[in-house]
Amino acid sequence: MRRKMMMRGALACALAACGAAGAQVLAPWTPVKATADAVETWGRAYAFASNALPTRIVSQGRDLLAAPIRVVCAGADGADHVWTKAGSWVQAATDEAADVCGHLAVPDVFVNATTRIEYDGMAKVALAVTPGKGSSRMRNLSKVWLEIPLRPEAATLFCYSPCSWAKLENVGAVKGPMAWPFRCSVWLGNEDVGLCWFCESDERLAAADPNRVVEVIPGAAETVLRVHLADGALTRPTTWTFGLQATPTKPFDRRLMTGQTVHAPPMGAGIPGLGVKRPEVWWTCQRALPQGNAGKVLAEAARGGVKTVVFHEDWIPIQNNPSPRPDFKGLVDACHRLGLKVLVYLGYELSPLDPMWGACEADCLAHDARGNPVSYWDREPAQRDYRVCYNNRFADIWLARAKKAYVELGLDGFYLDGTVMPRACANAAHGCGWTDAAGRRHVTYPIFAVREMMRALYAFVDARGGRIDAHQSGYVCPATLAFAHSYWDGEQLAVSGGARDIKAELDLASFRAEFMGRNHGLACEFLAYQKPGWQYEDALAISLLHGVMTRPCGFANVPPFTPIWKAYADFGTADAAWRPYWAKEAVACDAAHVKVSAYEKPDGALWVVSNVSPTDAATARLALPLGCRAARDAKTGEALPVAGGSLTLALEPFRYRLVRLWKE
């Protein structure tokens, strides 16, 4: 069963590593470079130095590891084995991937590891523990742990998946020891770099405490990510398959920093507490253009600075089936005449209205651990949509449909709602899930299958100059997210019920860990649904501070963003140096809750000044750069008084100012 689940992703990876027809190094990555026991990819390097697993991982010139990655095995007496033999070598290498083989040994136990490192830096590891010399039976082994010792300065932030949307607990600062049940993806890093461990299944993980499968243990010399592979004696040879990937995965595309994207419908329709009624009828782009006055609305959007329009699910009558009504092509053409690019919605569901439903519902839908299909969405025309799993033949059907629509409609990209997320699935018909000794089913996460589907879509779209925009709230695993150009994150903060205080919950460290993009390798836009206590101005106060634009939902919400986009474009933030508030050389400010991030050029700067306190107003005095001669509010043009080498601003709670500075 497990072997069948891995087949799609494993076969594609093997073909790529062998240089099979169709394999290629996609832009902006560079070919793999391999030496005797080290592998380099764009911006990163993995060295093995006679060890089964990496002894050194470097990202952007920075060492991530404090010591070699460890396989910790204990003997029957509880004492850790001290490996007496070790070695590694590069077995094979092409431009697309390299295979590294490594081993550790004591007389009673052998550890063998094969690591395939692909051009985007994804390292897929098969780690096997077998009987040692002279015996075919496991003996003298009472535990197996994987320990990844990271430099403390390279592991100040964390994020993991899957997560609950009820409370923002899966991201933040590493402040002390943490322990969790199985997580399919765990990233540790800082504002610039990081390392992700990911795994599709907990089938072979035998932790004594199911709530401590994964641990993070900070220390003065190293911060350890520990995975409990086995907390008891192994009775037979065992192999664990997992992945490692250093981030960022690719060069940060500064062109996408300024946003100027509008999500065409007023998002949040039908979500309790947001006060937006879901439509009860269907026509093409009903929520985006309820009056049908497309020409006027699109022209106003273009004048307001919009560069890209994203049409949500109602561009098509059948969910996740990119076969629109004939009138949609005219809408795409109208956008193009105004210089607007068009992205369209695709997602993660299969509808009973889809002509492929009868042929696919049994073996292509995602099932929960009880064997039930999963659905929490319905829409017009009347249909209940079910979560699909892409670890099966439907991935090929979906890809073919997407490519056909892209070409026929002249699209500029896709907005992928959850597609990049390997969703939990236990459908045995296509190999997902596993059954324990008591007969209970468990879900698995098809990371490698989704990765190969995303790689194929990225190759197609990127070759045509298009954009893949991934919506993935709560999920930042680079194995799949690398094959997107941007991501839209934040829905988990907006949809949960109750009196949720988002401004208090979303601390700065959490934003830097998940929502910033730079440390993961692609631009992020922040998602905010307006509701009492959480408006666009609130979202902008924290997002702009981190170099992230909040995306407006609905054409009616474009006007407040127009002066922001104009200020960024006029200054040229895409080619300016960026000095964030956490940098050692950050702009000096005398108010504790006021932070300043700066875009800088030789002749001046654009400051984002934010009061991040949810409750307290602040008056802040800011130290001006040497030679500053004038300051203005970049949104309104208002002149701001400069005196004594400083600027004083008053800010209400969770509000910001954009300040343009000029030098002599």
Question: Where are the model-predicted features located?
Answer:
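Aromatic-lined substrate-binding rim segments of carbohydrate-active enzymes
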Residues: 316-346, 442
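Aromatic- and acidic-residue-enriched carbohydrate-binding clefts of CAZyme catalytic domains
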Residues: 310, 315-324, 355-393, 422-451
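Active-site and adjacent substrate-binding regions of carbohydrate-active enzymes
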Residues: 393-477
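Active-site-adjacent "subsite" loops/lids of carbohydrate-active enzymes
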Residues: 290, 328, 332-333, 342-409, ...
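C-terminal beta-strand-rich structural cap/linker in extracellular carbohydrate-active enzymes
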Residues: 239, 643-664
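Surface-exposed beta-strand/loop patches in extracellular or lumenal glycoproteins
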Residues: 137-151, 612-627
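Active-site-proximal substrate-binding groove within the catalytic cores of carbohydrate-active enzymes
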Residues: 446, 451-626, 632-635
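Carbohydrate-recognition beta-sandwich/jelly-roll modules
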Residues: 40, 46-60, 65-76, 83-86, ...
